[in-house]
């Protein structure tokens, strides 16, 4: 590279140190400032660079490490040369008392000349209120101020367009922006610290949507790290790891859905959820292609909601999305963030709600992501007894740090408000609540009161739920909580965690355990299939048959069942109909609706080819009918959370492997559910019924169209008050189909 022109010293002025062309000495302090600037350790580069009024005029200093020459271009077209001072810093005086609008004309050794705006002439893009709220950990719209935001500023020389980069790194010794725009060399783009709030900021003109970027962070430990933006709105597709500048331009069309949602009480509405892993439902589809195919499929099957396994960006596909590195960016595997908005919008327009799995319990150790972000344990807890998850070898958030809690609460709001998500299923809540979760004695630290409860996590969950419900009426916050923690779905003002629903893991484990026994032996395990009603109203429950039950050697739902192919299918049909009639909402993982034989594989996807076989096509037909009948039968959902919605008829027939109960609607409607988990039919069984008159069978899982044997009720069922039975004023003789479930409704006198 050709040497830059020497700085001339005016005649007659003694200057023992290097001088600029105006004769002002290059003091040791100024040299040290420039050295710190180039080294990336200057906390306020804007104090040195940019335009600053002085006695001689307006000083303009520019950092252009690779430039041959730099001139200031003024609004009147004149140019003022900025001589090179030291290590790529150019400086000179522009006549006048006030800072003018200007641009920099930068020439390089190859003759290239560029006219660019100066990043260091711009004021901070964060206001005092934003800084205060960040410092307090109370900025509920954190994504509006952190991350990368494209901006436009008017000026005499023409509007300036660029991107404001803002990142929280309170212990960093310096932060620079790197990306496509500077050939991934951050020397020319050091950021300024905004003080004790810990935020670093820089507006870079000329950087727009689609630009890849990262932060170079000089940690408190003296180590430079290249970090993805924790609040990036878009990313490169894995395995690449850069963040991407993205501005949403999506126009939503779901106002009607949002209005109805805000007025609804999901506890008193039908809610059947189809759980989906987007990458393997039909492998190879984009968000927009899924919007065409998935929407039609879910509507055909009649589910009220879908629940997506985590969509936030994650580097390892085999984690299924549960090891998140970019909490504010939908994965780039299937398209842009606006493409994902389109998928949600299409589902809403079809009357289908959207839940997301959300993972605040832990995050991976990837060195380019959140781990030791500023050279310290920033997002993670510094004590490994609280900061490392022993099951997954991941890091645990420091819930006691207000800024970290703010990051997570704002992230939940981001998905709910920016993507119109209808609720979040919070993953691994139990691992957050207990300090000794998966830890042996001596591997965990008690709380301040000597207990094992994680008090910081409890406070975080309460804040999360209270804030989410306050800002977004009609949503659902759902806990995957596998213990008997009290009050998970109780309101925060009465001491609860504030969730709207909780997965009923006990029902799932007990029911699957019962059904895996041969029918001959089920009589000895009858309590497993009845115990759920002992605590059914202790929380607001979702009954989950989720992805977790069909992986890691647990076998598919179909192959958990005993017997030959017909018996397995019959058992599974009975399970689903029993589940849909049991108090609580329902969740079914994709593939289970067609009785998939293999365990789920995120690489292979759903075994759609099985639908050519009658048993599998019949299972899908049954699920569609279950959802149709469920939505149209108030007794199955309007009193899910109160004991008045359920009455046992007979829960004690262990030897016959049968159950019978009533479900009541808030309008007085009633449904009788007859369950037979034995392999033989039970004809001419007397069952108690609340009303005398005609009863009609609306569902029989043993029907031929579902793949059953065709054992059904003998036409219209006449209930009579001549023989009160099972605590009911009337009764009738009915048939319990083999390995089947029958639903009866009152048809009138």
Curated annotation (Swiss-Prot):
Pathway of action: Glycan biosynthesis; glycogen biosynthesis
EC number: 2.4.1.18
CDD domains named in the record: AmyAc_Glg_BE, E_set_GBE_prok_N
Catalytic activity annotation: Transfers a segment of a (1->4)-alpha-D-glucan chain to a primary hydroxy group in a similar glucan chain
InterPro entries linked: A-amylase/branching_C, Branching_enzy, GlgB, GlgB_N, GlgB_N_E_set_prok, Glyco_hydro_13_cat_dom, Glyco_hydro_13_N, Glyco_hydro_b
Keyword Transferase: yes
Keywords: Carbohydrate metabolism, Glycogen biosynthesis, Glycogen metabolism, Glycosyltransferase, Transferase
Gene Ontology MF terms: 1,4-alpha-glucan branching enzyme activity; cation binding; hydrolase activity, hydrolyzing O-glycosyl compounds
Biological process according to GO: glycogen biosynthetic process
One GO cellular component term: cytosol
Active site residues of this protein: 427 (nucleophile), 480 (proton donor)
Keyword Aminoacyl-tRNA synthetase: no
Xref: SUPFAM superfamilies: (Trans)glycosidases, E set domains, Glycosyl hydrolase domain
Family membership: Belongs to the glycosyl hydrolase 13 family. GlgB subfamily.
Function: Catalyzes the formation of the alpha-1,6-glucosidic linkages in glycogen by scission of a 1,4-alpha-linked oligosaccharide from growing alpha-1,4-glucan chains and the subsequent attachment of the oligosaccharide to the alpha-1,6 position.
Subunit structure comment from the entry: Monomer.
Protein name: 1,4-alpha-glucan branching enzyme GlgB
Organism: Thermobifida fusca (strain YX)
């Amino acid at each position: 590279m050709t040497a830059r022109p020497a700085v001339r010293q005016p005649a007659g002025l003694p200057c023992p140190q290097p001088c600029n062309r105006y004769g002002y000495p290059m003091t040791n302090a100024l040299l040290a400032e420039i050295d710190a600037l180039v080294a990336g350790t200057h906390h306020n580069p804007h104090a040195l660079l940019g335009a600053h009024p002085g006695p001689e005029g307006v000083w303009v200093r520019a950092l252009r490490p690779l430039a041959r020459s730099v001139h200031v271009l003024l609004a009147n077209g004149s140019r003022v040369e900025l001589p090179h001072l030291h290590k790529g810093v150019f400086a000179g005086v522009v006549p006048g008392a006030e800072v003018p609008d200007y641009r920099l004309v930068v020439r390089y050794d190859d003759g290239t000349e560029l006219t660019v705006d100066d990043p260091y002439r711009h004021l901070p893009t964060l206001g005092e209120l934003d800084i205060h709220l960040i410092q307090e950990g109370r900025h509920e719209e954190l994504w509006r101020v952190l991350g990368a935001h494209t901006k436009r500023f008017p000026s005499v020389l023409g509007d300036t367009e660029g991107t404001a980069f803002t990142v929280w790194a309170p212990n960093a010794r310096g932060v620079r922006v790197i990306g496509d725009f500077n050939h991934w060399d951050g020397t020319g783009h050091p950021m300024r610290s905004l003080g004790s709030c810990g935020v670093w900021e820089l507006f870079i003109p000329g950087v727009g949507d689609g630009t890849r970027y990262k932060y170079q962070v000089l940690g408190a430990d003296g180590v430079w790290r290249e970090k993805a933006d924790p609040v990036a709105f878009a990313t490169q597709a894995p395995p690449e790891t850069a963040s991407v500048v993205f501005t949403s331009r999506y126009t939503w069309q779901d106002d009607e859905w949002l209005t109805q949602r805000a007025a609804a009480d999901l506890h008193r509405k039908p809610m059947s959820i189809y759980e989906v892993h987007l990458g393997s439902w039909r492998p190879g589809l984009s968000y927009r292609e899924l919007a065409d195919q998935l929407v039609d499929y879910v509507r055909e099957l009649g589910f009220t909601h879908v629940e997506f396994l985590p969509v936030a960006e994650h580097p390892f596909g085999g984690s299924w999305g549960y090891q998140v590195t970019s909490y504010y960016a939908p994965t780039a595997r299937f398209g842009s963030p606006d493409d994902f908005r389109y998928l949600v919008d299409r589902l809403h327009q079809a009357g289908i709600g959207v839940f997301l799995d959300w993972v605040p319990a832990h995050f991976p150790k990837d060195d380019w992501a959140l781990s030791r972000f500023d050279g310290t344990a920033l997002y993670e807890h510094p004590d490994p007894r609280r900061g490392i998850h022993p099951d997954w070898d991941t890091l645990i958030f420091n819930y006691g740090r207000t800024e970290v809690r703010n990051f997570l609460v704002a992230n939940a709001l981001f998905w709910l408000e920016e993507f119109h998500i209808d609720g979040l299923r919070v993953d691994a809540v139990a691992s957050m609540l207990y300090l000794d979760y998966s830890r042996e004695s001596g591997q965990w630290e008690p709380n301040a009161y000597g207990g094992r409860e994680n008090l910081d996590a409890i406070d975080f969950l309460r804040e999360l739920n209270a804030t989410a419900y306050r800002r977004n009426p009609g949503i659902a916050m759902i806990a995957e909580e596998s213990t008997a923690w009290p009050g998970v779905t109780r309101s925060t003002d009465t001491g609860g965690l504030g969730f709207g629903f909780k997965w009923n893991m006990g029902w799932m484990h007990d029911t699957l355990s019962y059904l895996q026994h041969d029918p001959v032996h089920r009589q000895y395990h009858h309590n497993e299939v009845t115990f759920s009603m002992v605590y059914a109203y202790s929380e607001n429950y979702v009954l989950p048959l989720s992805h977790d039950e069909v992986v890691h050697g647990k076998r598919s739902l179909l192959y958990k069942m005993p017997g030959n192919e017909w018996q397995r299918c019959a058992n599974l049909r009975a399970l689903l109909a029993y589940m849909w009639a049991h108090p609580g909402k329902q969740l079914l993982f994709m593939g289970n609706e067609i009785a998939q034989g293999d365990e789920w594989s995120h690489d292979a996807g759903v075994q759609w080819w099985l639908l050519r076989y009658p048993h599998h096509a019949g299972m899908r037909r049954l699920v569609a009918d279950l959802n149709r009948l469920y939505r149209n039968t108030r007794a199955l959902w309007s009193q899910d959370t109160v004991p008045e919605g359920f009455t046992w008829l007979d829960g004690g027939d262990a030897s016959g492997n049968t159950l019978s109960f009533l479900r009541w609607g808030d309008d007085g409607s009633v449904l009788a559910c007859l369950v037979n988990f034995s392999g033989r039919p039970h004809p001419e069984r007397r069952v108690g019924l609340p009303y005398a008159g005609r009863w009609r069978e609306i569902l029989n899982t043993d029907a031929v169209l579902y793949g059953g044997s065709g054992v059904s009720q003998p036409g219209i069922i006449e209930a009579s008050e001549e023989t009160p039975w099972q605590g009911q004023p009337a009764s009738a003789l009915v048939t319990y189909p083999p390995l089947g479930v029958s639903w009866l409704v009152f048809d009138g006198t």
